Amino acid sequence: DPSLVRDYLAYYMSRELGNYASKTEYCEVVINGDYKGLYVFQEKIKSNENRVNVLKIEATDNALPNITGGYITKADKTTGGDPVAFWMDETKFVHDLPKPENATPEQTQYIEAEFNRMEDHAYDDDLEDGYRTIIDVPSFVDFMLVNELCSNADVYQSSTFFHKDRGGKLRAGPVWDFNQ
C-alpha cells in the first residue's frame, strides 16, 4: 500500500466498532544516518486479554468442554511454512492458536467441524437453531463492513482471521492485512 493508510484506517474503524484490531504506529526509519522511509509498525495477532481474548487451548484439551476453545484460525494462502489444518472448497485454513505443531487431531477435527456447521447453516431460515447458534453475528457484520468499505482484496480467502473462546461462538476477526 503506497499510501500507508489502508491498514491504519481499517484497524481504526474496527476498534471504533468495539473490536480488537492491531495497534499501529507510523515511524520513520533511519539507519546509520541513511533515511530508509516511512513505515507502519503493527502488533502481531495473538491471544491475551488485551488482544484476542480467548483462553489458550492446551494439548490436553481434547474432550468437551475444554476442546471448545480457544482457537485463532486463519484462512490464508500458505507458502510452505504453515501446515494446512483443513480445507473448505479452495480455501486453506491454518492454526494460529494452538500453534500448528501443538494442535492435536481432535482439536483440528473440532474446529473444522465448527466451520462446517457454519457453512451448513449459512442459508438457514431458522433463526433460533440456525447460524445464530454457531456464530457471533455482530462480529461477522463488523468484520464484513470494515473489509468491504476498505475494499480488502485479500478478505475471505487470505489473511482472514476467526477466533473462538471456550464455550463461545465462532467470531470473525480480527481484521488484518489491507495493504493490497
Model-derived regions, located:
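Phosphate/dinucleotide-binding and metal-coordinating scaffold of catalytic cores
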Residues: 1-180
